Design a protein with these regions (language model features):
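Positively charged n-region of N-terminal signal peptides that target proteins for export
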Residues: 1-5
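Bacterial N-terminal signal peptides
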Residues: 7-17
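Acidic, small-residue rich beta-repeat scaffolds with periodic aromatic anchors
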Residues: 19-84, 176-263
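Beta-propeller blade termini
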Residues: 49-53, 112-122, 165-176
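Acidic/hydrophobic-patterned starts of short beta strands in beta-sheet-rich repeat architectures
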Residues: 61-65, 121-134, 175-180
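Blade-edge motifs of beta-propeller repeat domains
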Residues: 83-110, 153-169, 176-178, 206
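Beta-propeller blade repeat segments, especially FG-GAP/WD-type strand-to-loop junctions
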Residues: 88-91, 141-158, 194-199
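Short glycine/acidic-enriched loop and turn motifs that connect beta-strands
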Residues: 136-139, 184-186
Length: 263
């Protein structure tokens, strides 16, 4: 009888210990998605520094970004932007200038990993210029500030005309600039413009503008082009079309200049 009671007591104690240990063991941590934790904006809290070659016969230029601190959002995305950019020539410890006249106050924190601060030959004169992305969005539309390098003064000069171009693509082979703005409806509402450089300014030579009339349920596409010997743009196409399918538009947003001469 005694042995039976002892055996039962040991069984109960063993069950109690096992149950207590299991209760104290931490539950497995659910897997987390690292993609959700990744910020979508560049963290400029500590500033930034860029080095560019402007021309083969010039020393390297350094651009030092002073940050404008802002609190991150609830998802951890940095909202710090630019307060000032100092420019250094070669090994000089003294800045030769600051990049002026851009409205830094309205700047958005740039996309993480983007080429938001870059040197490109915007006016095709053999000298790289400076582009800084100021605004951007999910539609792909962009707005930046541009400073053209002036070889006479050896300084970077703000260009209002180039800064108003929006999202742009340079074509050094044809020395043209193509811009594109997205108005919605899967990109079928858009405006695309091609520019040449005259008197150090972008001059439009072709525009393709497409909209959608919700009353008529039709797309409206207008193409304007500058003719030889003329300065003004003239309308070469003005068409309406009902979409045969979803977002089936008369002008192709992916290649708006395809059917236009001197592409």
């Amino acid at each position: 009888m005694f042995h039976k009671i002892l055996s039962t007591l040991i069984t109960v104690l063993t069950f109690f210990v096992v149950s207590t240990t299991a209760a104290q063991r931490p539950s497995p941590t659910p897997p987390t998605s690292h993609a959700q934790d990744e910020p979508i904006t560049e963290d400029l809290s500590y500033g930034a520094m860029f080095k560019f070659t402007i021309a083969p016969d010039l020393p390297e230029f350094t651009f030092k970004v002073t940050p404008e601190p802002q609190k991150p959002d609830e998802y951890g995305n940095s909202h710090t932007t630019v307060r000032n950019v100092q420019v250094f020539r070669g090994d000089s410890k003294q800045p030769m200038q600051s990049l002026e006249d851009c409205e830094w106050e309205g700047m958005e924190a740039p996309p993480r990993g983007s080429d938001w601060f870059r040197a490109e030959d915007m006016n095709f004169d053999g000298y790289n210029d400076i582009y800084v992305l100021i605004n951007w969005g999910a539609t792909g539309n962009e707005l930046g500030c541009v400073w053209l390098y002036d070889p006479k003064s050896s300084h970077f000069v703000f260009s209002k005309e180039f800064s108003e171009l929006g999202r742009l693509t340079l074509n050094p082979a044809t020395k043209t600039i193509a811009t594109h703005s997205n108005g919605g409806m899967a990109g079928t509402i858009f405006r695309a413009t091609k520019y040449v450089i005259e008197d150090n300014r972008p001059v439009p030579v072709v525009t393709v503008a497409q909209d959608f009339d919700f009353d008529k349920r039709e797309y409206h596409c207008v193409v304007q082009q500058r003719r030889a010997g003329e300065n003004a743009l003239v309308t070469v196409r003005d068409g309406w079309a009902k979409p045969k399918g979803d977002f089936d538009a008369p002008c192709d947003a992916s290649d708006p200049f395809r059917s236009i001469g001197d592409k």
